[in-house]
Regions:
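An acidic/histidine-cluster motif and surrounding catalytic segment
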Residues: 1-100, 104-218
Length: 218
């Protein structure tokens, strides 16, 4: 892969998290990407009109009935942070990038070898490959097995994934973002090819502790 980006805020907490990331097995492979601090964001500014919306239909996603709620400032900042990284991938013509949030701090000891192998053996049409994620049981039936990979329709968490230049280009042209970033990415799955491998190689802090591999069910 060409780049390993870590989304981290320019705050005291962000600095501590970035330092923790530098102390992982990834070390100096990482490039910090300054995230958007949602609390300082003026979402009403005209430049965001066609880029992001605060309201999202939580009900249709959760239980199949319309129920509009507002995204929090943190969720809005997270969405724009990921969008900005995708834009960077396209602008800099990066072939393959890994995108990490700064709380993805636990790694399989063979992380680099596993990820290299995943990239080499991935379906040719991949746009996104999830590395750290959760698949709610209700969505497992929608997955399509392709060799050692599964084509994903719905997932939770976006703290660790690979993205191709083609995939990033697709996403930046699908705005406005009108849901939390993991939900919104999932909603693009009809036209964005999202895959997962049978391995989970990163864990989100406080979500899972020592998981190194998963079975065919989550």
């Amino acid at each position: 892969m060409n780049k390993l980006f870590v989304i981290s805020l320019d705050t005291d907490t962000g600095a501590k998290k970035w330092k923790s990331m530098q102390n992982t097995i990834l070390g100096n492979r990482l490039t910090k990407f300054t995230g958007v601090y949602g609390k300082l964001l003026n979402i009403e500014h005209p430049k965001y009109n066609n880029l992001i919306k605060r309201d999202w239909d939580y009900g249709s996603w959760k239980y199949g009935r319309r129920d509009i709620v507002e995204m929090s400032d943190s969720e809005l900042g997270c969405c724009l942070s990921h969008f900005n990284v995708w834009n960077k991938v396209v602008e800099d013509d990066i072939d393959v990038a890994m995108i990490l949030e700064d709380d993805a701090i636990r790694y399989n000891k063979k992380f680099i070898d596993i990820t290299d192998d995943i990239i080499k053996t991935a379906p040719k049409n991949w746009d996104i490959i999830l590395l750290g994620f959760m698949i709610p049981n209700r969505y497992l039936k929608d997955e399509i097995k392709v060799g050692d990979f599964y084509k994903v329709k719905e997932f939770v968490l976006a703290h660790s994934y690979l993205i191709s230049n083609k995939g990033a280009n697709k996403l930046i042209h699908k705005t406005p973002i009108n849901a939390p970033i993991d939900t919104w990415m999932s909603l693009q799955s009809p036209t964005v090819n999202i895959y997962r491998h049978n391995y989970i190689v990163t864990n989100k802090n406080l979500i899972q502790s020592n998981l190194v591999a998963q079975s065919d069910t989550v």
